[in-house]
């Protein structure tokens, strides 16, 4: 792109950053420093506002950049992410949303510790939540780096690295200054921008093919170089048994992982009642479902109009398919329309990244302060002290996310999110479901469920082709690959459930049935909910 084109895109980036910083400053004027205000925004948001914020939190760089890129490169197999991300919300709606809102205050650990020995359970759940959040943050950082590399013509590695650092700095500012209230409004603004941008691009793609989806798919298949195989399963997850098991593993992780994501669970605490939480999820499903239907058109549109080779040439993982599609739909690289549309889409993608990293950072810093700090500190911490720790933790989490984001910069963002979902489904979902629905569940079972899912998931990722043993690995020059699957969910998710069951049946501690009855009534009726 020319210097003028880069300037326009950077101006739009800067405008969004200025708006979000203004929102953060405005929201932080009247803050009182209470934990409820910092973690939950005072529980003052309406179901519609929270539904938009949930969708803004969930529709990440993985959705806008990564999924469309995978569809553009691998056709049918890329659709697994679309189906998995959407179907996952049925699990959230029917099993989690209302019960979590009634039983907890700020974090996942609040729900689990309601009927257990608090200290070991909070430490385990807090550790797991921070781990999942950092993995999810890494994907957003990689998306930011890919976006700016494209904007600057892919020639400046330093600019790409500084972008990752800049995103990390901004997310710390958003969280430490504005807490949940600022984060929520940033996510609402971003959701509106993202839906508007996706609708505009989808309409332009359909107009290009005269509204004929069949023609769009045929053109994508012809341009892909794979013919009809592009529209059939197996291009990415086909062939041998390893690829097929990887397909199943990823599907399990995507469908079950959403219900264990800390930054999604924390959104249910920002509304006043469980009924409002359920209605928030209904709003979110409508928005998210509409968005993922559009990613189908955008992914195949990028394959048909831009071509997989051009997408892969810009970014090997496919993370730049949507901006390239916008450039072409607007008239090409040398046209004013192409430049403007590219800049708008790039700014929306950047807004997507900033909004999501703010929500994830807030959830992880809340886990550090509310779960780990208060548990490791023998004396009960004051709310203001806890909030101070959360703000400090945001800085540390930002540094870790930046470092890992620089390391993983060449991986696909949707793939990285798939790993985060696998860890969430392995470590957080078993303990959450057991706590809510199993009367005989014990403290040992809770701790074993978390670590029995978390440790194998991380270990299997380290021993997988993601880290070593192939040209696409993080460390292609070494080989300590002993686990053949790229996503550990198929093995680690059952292990999490098994460990929770085994820890409970071997525990000498009798289950507290009175506390379970109290929790059950509270979760179903809302009696005594905060």
Where are these regions (language model features)?
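Loop-to-helix junctions at membrane interfaces in multi-pass transport proteins
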Residues: 2-6, 42-45, 49, 66-80, ...
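A generic transmembrane alpha-helix motif of multi-pass inner-membrane proteins
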Residues: 2-24, 246, 443-530
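Alpha-helical transmembrane segments
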Residues: 5-18, 81-92, 244-253, 347-354, ...
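Membrane-interface loop-to-helix entry segments
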Residues: 5-36, 106-108, 113-149, 162-222, ...
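Structural signal for membrane-spanning alpha-helices in multi-pass inner-membrane proteins
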Residues: 20-27, 92-96, 171, 175, ...
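Short, Lys/Arg-enriched, Gly/Pro-containing loop segments at transmembrane-helix junctions
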Residues: 32-38, 110, 213-218, 414-417, ...
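Helix-loop-helix junctions that connect adjacent transmembrane helices in secondary transporters/permeases
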Residues: 67-177, 267-418, 528-530
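Hydrophobic cores of alpha-helical transmembrane segments in multi-pass inner/ER membrane proteins
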Residues: 87-94, 427-432, 436, 492-503
């Amino acid at each position: 792109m020319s210097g003028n084109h880069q300037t326009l895109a950077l101006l739009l980036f800067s405008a969004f950053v200025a708006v979000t910083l203004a929102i953060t400053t405005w929201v932080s004027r009247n803050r009182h420093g209470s934990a409820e205000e910092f973690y939950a925004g005072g529980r003052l948001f309406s179901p519609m506002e929270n539904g938009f914020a949930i969708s803004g939190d969930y529709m990440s760089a993985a959705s806008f950049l990564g999924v469309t890129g995978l569809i553009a490169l691998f056709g049918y197999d890329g659709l697994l992410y679309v189906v998995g991300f959407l179907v996952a919300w049925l699990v959230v709606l029917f099993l989690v949303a209302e019960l979590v809102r009634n039983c907890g205050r700020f974090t996942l650990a609040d729900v689990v510790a309601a009927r257990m020995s608090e200290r070991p359970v909070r430490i385990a759940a807090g550790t797991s939540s921070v781990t999942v959040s950092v993995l999810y943050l890494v994907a957003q950082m990689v998306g930011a780096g890919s976006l700016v590399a494209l904007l600057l013509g892919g020639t400046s590695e330093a600019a790409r690295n500084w972008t990752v650092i800049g995103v990390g700095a901004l997310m710390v500012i958003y969280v430490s200054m504005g807490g949940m209230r600022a984060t929520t409004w940033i996510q609402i603004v971003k959701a509106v921008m993202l839906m508007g941008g996706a609708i505009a691009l989808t309409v332009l793609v359909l107009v290009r093919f005269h509204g004929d989806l069949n023609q769009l798919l045929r053109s994508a298949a012809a341009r892909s170089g794979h013919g009809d195989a592009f529209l059939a399963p197996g291009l990415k997850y086909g062939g041998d048994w390893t690829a097929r098991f990887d397909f199943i593993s990823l599907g399990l992780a995507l469908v079950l992982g959403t219900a264990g994501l800390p930054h999604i669970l924390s959104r249910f605490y920002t509304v006043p009642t469980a009924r409002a939480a359920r209605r928030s999820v209904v709003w979110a499903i409508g928005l998210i479902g509409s968005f993922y239907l559009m990613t189908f058109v955008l992914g195949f549109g990028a394959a048909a109009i831009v071509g997989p080779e051009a997408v892969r040439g810009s970014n090997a993982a496919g993370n730049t398919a949507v901006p390239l599609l916008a450039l072409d739909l607007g008239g090409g690289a040398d046209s004013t329309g192409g430049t403007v549309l590219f800049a708008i889409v790039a700014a929306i993608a950047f807004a997507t990244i900033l909004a999501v990293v703010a929500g994830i950072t807030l959830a992880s810093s809340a886990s550090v302060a509310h779960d780990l700090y208060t548990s490791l500190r023998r004396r009960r911490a004051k709310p203001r002290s806890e909030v101070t720790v959360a703000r400090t933790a945001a800085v540390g989490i930002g540094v870790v996310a930046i470092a890992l984001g620089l390391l993983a910069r060449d991986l696909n963002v949707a793939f990285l999110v798939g790993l985060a979902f696998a860890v969430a489904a392995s470590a957080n979902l078993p303990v959450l479901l057991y706590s809510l629905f199993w009367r005989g569940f014990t403290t040992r079972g809770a701790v074993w469920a978390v670590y029995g899912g978390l440790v194998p998931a991380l270990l299997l990722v380290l021993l997988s082709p993601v880290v070593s043993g192939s040209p696409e690995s993080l460390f292609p020059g070494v080989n300590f690959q002993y686990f053949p699957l790229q996503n550990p969910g198929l093995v680690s998710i059952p292990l999490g459930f098994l460990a929770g069951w085994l820890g409970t049946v071997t525990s000498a501690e009798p289950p507290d049935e009175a506390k379970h009855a109290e929790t059950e009534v509270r979760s179903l009726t809302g009696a005594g909910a905060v």
